[in-house]
Amino acid sequence: MSSSVAVCNSPVFSPSSSLFCNKPLNTSPAHETLTLSLSHLNPPVSSTSPSAASPTSPFCLRLLKPPAKLGFGSDSGPGSILKRKRPTTLDIPVAPVGIAAPISNADTPREESRAVEREGDGYSVYCKRGKREAMEDRFSAITNLQGDPKQAIFGVYDGHGGPTAAEFAAKNLCSNILGEIVGGRNESKIEEAVKRGYLATDSEFLKEKNVKGGSCCVTALISDGNLVVANAGDCRAVLSVGGFAEALTSDHRPSRDDERNRIESSGGYVDTFNSVWRIQGSLAVSRGIGDAHLKQWIISEPEINILRINPQHEFLILASDGLWDKVSNQEAVDIARPFCKGTDQKRKPLLACKKLVDLSVSRGSLDDISVMLIQLCHLF
């Protein structure tokens, strides 16, 4: 098993407190996919939409039938290496679309439409729009995989240059990962399958007509007692281990030496403006889905972390950088942990998500913020 990076600050709340479940969570017999998307999925998935009068409920996407067999595909070939030169600054447009509620392109999102919340089998999520006209964050969740309540896959997606790429990733990335995974337990095969799922989603998005923008992604697959976390970009996964925060992902930004070296060796240019490192004077993240105009440098290959879930693993936080730019890993665990204690009736994980979002906003965040909390005691 690959190891994770521990953040060793002492938690405010005693790590010795037990967060074990007293009883299992009831689960629905069907797969459930949740996104903030505004359009239907392709077959074999159908969607149902809430009314426009219910802005706090995202679209519910339900898988009609679990896959009979999960198979492997082929790897993508390597990209070409371009000659390095300093280009002009590129502007990323922002698409004028609505947020979670189904509103017209011409409408200005209403104040009550700025937040979206959802609770499902073993997880809660809360998203709040920042100062942009359009909400660019998305999320997805598929639980009860193949009829097993202890198997699930989750994702949080942070779009830039409009919500199109994040919406596409929310609809397709987790399904693509599942389509690549064989039901076996071989760790190397699972890691390779997750990688191919990311690469396939990126390739499919770039084939769409008039695509623009991109999206950072973080996903968490839970299967057979294993936790498989992957990321491309600066969405982050943080695990509470007995009250201590462990970052299971590393942000992909051009300020990282290895990322900057990769970009420059491929002919790209990295510089800093107002203390922010950017690629080609434009983008501040170095991996993700989309970004066709920077594709030779913005790769979609994820970094992957696999570990065996044990009783000390209490809950997992997946969140966009709207949270992590203002709230540290340990702070997030300390704030969420009291709401994850006790019996199912006493737990309030959705309130924990809201508390984290509100803290980031109170510290000056102007970005979209999405926080998903996954209670691992239900899933191992």
Swiss-Prot record:
Mn(2+) 2 binds at residues 158, 321, 367. The keyword Manganese applies. Residues 122-376 form the PPM-type phosphatase domain. Keywords: Hydrolase, Magnesium, Manganese, Metal-binding, Protein phosphatase. Belongs to the PP2C family. PANTHER family: PROTEIN PHOSPHATASE (PTHR47992). This is Probable protein phosphatase 2C 2. It comes from Arabidopsis thaliana (Mouse-ear cress).
